[in-house]
């Protein structure tokens, strides 16, 4: 997987390693869908969609969480397990309830602990992994202190988030059926793993989270009495969700599992999408290209199909061939930053000096609209290096290092940029900002190291 990701140019499924050491998956189509799904819920909650967002985490577990700020983190496993976009909206609404409620997450040594909020408790997770004895042990009285320590949201906070989520769903005019059906899935899963038991040691009221079955009963009245309960689902969102779900399955899952789930006889858009990724991961570029060509033939103006076509060409050693579909995908997607950064990478990969100006233009546009793309900064730095612009090469390196948490490189590169840029210019001020933040972080690291050595 890492070998493949090293080749990816950030427009398709791009990995970013945050401080919490969890992998964030970035994809233009997926992010657009999640933002469209969450937008009415953010508005209903009184949050600005410009300042709030949903981030996808590479993790097969069924989970979502908040960790400070106005960001909802959703695991890829939740997308895989959901039957509809409406179910995911129910989970997002619940998470927004935590944000609006100001529910603090557990902090340990200055770092946030990611919290499971869907009642898949530690014991259930252990049982699901095949360790029944370990799961039972976690649920014993002697382990309750550990559960209480590492699961930060209290039962009251969970119930409060449920109530707030139901309110936001109803206010947004979205059916609450998905919220209830997803909680029903969780209840069934807990039954399957033997969580519900007559064992007196397993006291539902002693758990940090309320039980899913109790939460469903509490939610029913609020959701079922709302005018939007029987409102038809947004079919545009549902169709897009099935596409994204298939794309993620093709990208994340074992190719054998993907091909079993979407056999060649299945000629749906979702199946072509999933198989294209599965074949691409498996090192079969011709089969991957054939699946992608079927998608482009069906919808020749779909930017995400064109993006995939260009990506496969690029990674198959044909960067020149990749430019046309990626250029069209960028235009059709209103210059989506992640797609534009892939176009910039393809232009660079031709090693043709005639393409440097266009590469610089599209990459600068990409980072201007999305500053959280380290690969785009890497490519932009390469453009500057090939043009002999040492100052901006150093600044781009500082930007990327700062984003990746590489304090030492950010500090040195920002100093180098400041030394070469006109003092007071916009780029010089930006280099100074990075330098000041990096210097503070560097000093704190040295102080901490000194305390540990005492």
Task: Identify the residue ranges that each predicted region occupies.
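Alpha-helical linker/edge segments of TPR/alpha-solenoid repeat scaffolds
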Residues: 192-193, 317-320, 352-356, 387-395, ...
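Helix-start (N-cap) detector for alpha-helical repeat units in TPR-like alpha-solenoids
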Residues: 269, 303-304, 320, 337-338, ...
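Residue at a conserved register position within TPR or TPR-like alpha-solenoid repeats
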Residues: 279, 313, 347-350, 384, ...
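Canonical tetratricopeptide repeat
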Residues: 274, 308, 342-343, 379, ...
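Catalytic Zn2+-binding segment of zinc metalloproteases
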Residues: 96-113, 129
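Extracytoplasmic and endomembrane cell-envelope/extracellular-matrix remodeling and assembly machinery
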Residues: 26-28, 32, 54, 149, ...
